[in-house]
């Protein structure tokens, strides 16, 4: 992954500089999150964009047709540059690196929350308040994901701190306690 990060950083830094100059960093950060969601959920889109068979011009045309109305010109230009340079395989790394740099610049803490089932709006709001209290700031970006292996409950990762309130975690801790007792 370090090689991919070293490839992604210059693109992400350039995008951050351009979006800062145009006062659209927050908008582009939200668009990056949406694009990452599409990238993760659509294998067809992802496979087409990283395919060595498709010409860069075809990829650019597809990106323009699909995303022109959904993203800012700055972000569209970056996507076209990645297509031109055959770097769309680094798309996810570039978007994630941009989001890291944006959060760092804005003083936003990232909290990753994995839950056994999708959380309701009320649960998300309550969890958000708890995470903000844990982080000691109201500037918290919560990344929610569903992990059925947790069986029940959730796991919050906030920097190097991990709070495991999952059923799978409780079973694991119980097993360790029983192993020590015997």
From Swiss-Prot:
**Which SUPFAM superfamilies does the record associate with it?**
N-terminal domain of the delta subunit of the F1F0-ATP synthase
As for subcellular location, the record says:
Cellular thylakoid membrane
Could you tell me which InterPro entries the record lists for this protein? Answer: ATP_synth_OSCP/delta_N_sf (IPR026015), ATPase_OSCP/dsu (IPR000711)
Q: Does the keyword Membrane apply?
A: yes
Highest taxon listed in the record's lineage? Bacteria
Q: How does it sit in the membrane?
A: Peripheral membrane protein
Primary localization:
membrane
Give all cystine bridges in this chain: none
Task: Name a Pfam family for this protein.
Answer: OSCP
What molecular function terms (GO) are annotated for this protein?
proton-transporting ATP synthase activity, rotational mechanism
* Record's keyword terms, sorted: ATP synthesis, CF(1), Hydrogen ion transport, Ion transport, Membrane, Thylakoid, Transport
A GO CC annotation given for this chain? plasma membrane-derived thylakoid membrane
Under the heading NCBIfam families, the entry gives:
ATP_synt_delta (TIGR01145)
Function (record text): F(1)F(0) ATP synthase produces ATP from ADP in the presence of a proton or sodium gradient. F-type ATPases consist of two structural domains, F(1) containing the extramembraneous catalytic core and F(0) containing the membrane proton channel, linked together by a central stalk and a peripheral stalk. During catalysis, ATP synthesis in the catalytic domain of F(1) is coupled via a rotary mechanism of the central stalk subunits to proton translocation.
Report quaternary structure and partners.
F-type ATPases have 2 components, F(1) - the catalytic core - and F(0) - the membrane proton channel. F(1) has five subunits: alpha(3), beta(3), gamma(1), delta(1), epsilon(1). CF(0) has four main subunits: a(1), b(1), b'(1) and c(10-14). The alpha and beta chains form an alternating ring which encloses part of the gamma chain. F(1) is attached to F(0) by a central stalk formed by the gamma and epsilon chains, while a peripheral stalk is formed by the delta, b and b' chains.
What is stated as this protein's family in its record? Answer: Belongs to the ATPase delta chain family.
Known HAMAP family for this protein? ATP_synth_delta_bact
Write down what this protein is called.
ATP synthase subunit delta
What is the species of this protein?
A: Synechococcus sp. (strain CC9902)
- The encoding gene is atpH
